[in-house]
Every structure is written in structure tokens, then in C-alpha cells.
Amino acid sequence: MQQPFNYPYPQIYWVDSSASSPWAPPGTVLPCPTSVPRRPGQRRPPPPPPPPPLPPPPPPPPLPPLPLPPLKKRGNHSTGLCLLVMFFMVLVALVGLGLGMFQLFHLQKELAELRESTSQMHTASSLEKQIGHPSPPPEKKELRKVAHLTGKSNSRSMPLEWEDTYGIVLLSGVKYKKGGLVINETGLYFVYSKVYFRGQSCNNLPLSHKVYMRNSKYPQDLVMMEGKMMSYCTTGQMWARSSYLGAVFNLTSADHLYVNVSELSLVNFEESQTFFGLYKL
């Protein structure tokens, strides 16, 4: 059989191991020739092309994200802190409740003791009344020394006379006698007086208003306060002016206080406009 000589690769021969060979024992494999002798005029076949380069290996897959232990620790820490705060709040509430219960119990106990002592005193007083023992007299309250007198329209002479019975007058611990206030206890007193002057036509007469004191220890009247007015209105026109006096004095028993004015006809005796008074400090 004729073999083709234009085959690009060397021929391979297989040896049957079952056939006997005069050059080798049975079961021996003979080597295959690496090349076939070239005949004259025959070209050597070109070498096979090199194998293509292998592709680069794929990049390794990305690593999975690691857990964040600080966040877990922070969450655990905040949870523990919240629990601790809640515990302290509950503890404070329980302590406050306990203190409130203790105070309530203490108040109830004091109230019971007070009721018991009151009932005992009431029982003792009722027994004394039944036996006939007189109860102690009530303590006398000291009267406040005070006086407030208002103007009296029928006053026609000096010193001024005052209303001591009707209206907004007040007398306590002080006597009123013939236009004057009589002091019956030594001490510091605030003395005051107000006089309201008015007229239909102004003639600018000098006006005076004074408070004076009389006492058997002094040979003459002692002026305590005095007020004067000059050029107080426009000539020929209607006018009105007030004069107020007030000060603190050390008065003794049996002192008599009076009020005097220069023009009695110009005085308005309304109780809210003209008055005289004092009170002990």
C-alpha cells in the first residue's frame, strides 16, 4: 500500500503486542521513529504555530465586609446606661413614696395626739364647771390709742370744734374735750391735721393753720406745727387751697391738743376735707 508523502506530521506506527518479532521478545513495544527520512527535492513541512497565550487569571473575589464590633459595643453600652438611669429613677420614686408615707403617718399621729389633748382639756374644764371652780378671767386686750375727728359746720370760735359722734369719727383710748384731744398715756404719737380753705372771690388774705398744745406745766400754749399761705390765688376769682400738717411727738399724760386757723369764715368743714387726729406708735 502506498503512503502519501505530503502528510504534514510524522507517521506513527503501532505494534501489536500479540505478534511475534524476531528482534524482540513478545510483549515488547518498539519505539516509533521521530522522523521519516526526507527524499531529495522534498521540503520540510513548517513547524506548527505556537499555542495561543493563556488568558490572565481572573481577579480574586472581594472579601466580605467585616462586622463592626464597636457599634455593637456602643449599642450595648447605651442600652446598659438607659437601664441604669431607669433603675435610679425607679429608686428615687420609691424613696419619695416612702418619705411621703412616713410624713403622712407622722401627721396622722400628731393629729391624733392633738385631738386627744383637746378632748382631755375639754373634759377637765367641764369637770371644773361642774365642781364649781371658777375659770380664770380672760386677758384684757390693750386698747389702741387712736383718734380721728372731722370738721363741724357750727364751729364759730377758736380753737376749732370737731365732730366726735357722727360720721367717720374714731375715738379709742383718747378723750375729746372742748375742741381738744386729751392724752391719758405717755408715749410717741403721730399727730395730723388738714384744713380746706375756699372762697368765692380772692383777696389774698394771709392764711395760717397751726396745731398747739396746752399743759399745766407750761405757762402758755406751745405751737407744735404751723402752716402759712401768701399770694395763693388770683385776685377777684374763685379759689380753694388745702393745708396739711403731720409729725411725731413725745406726748405726756394730761396734754391737750388743739387746732387754730386765721380765717374761720374761709374753712370748708366737710368731713373728707377738714379733720384732726392722732394715733400712738
UniProtKB/Swiss-Prot annotation:
It comes from Homo sapiens (Human). This is Tumor necrosis factor ligand superfamily member 6. GO terms for molecular function: cytokine activity; death receptor binding; signaling receptor binding; tumor necrosis factor receptor binding. PROSITE patterns: THD_1, THD_2. Residues 118-128 have a biased composition (Polar residues). Belongs to the tumor necrosis factor family. One of its GO terms (cellular component) is cytoplasmic vesicle lumen. Residues 145-281 form the THD domain. It holds the Pfam family TNF. It is found in: Cell membrane; Cytoplasmic vesicle lumen; Lysosome lumen. Residues 20-71, 118-142 are annotated as: Disordered. Changing Y218 to F/R: Lowers binding to TNFRSF6 and abolishes cytotoxicity.
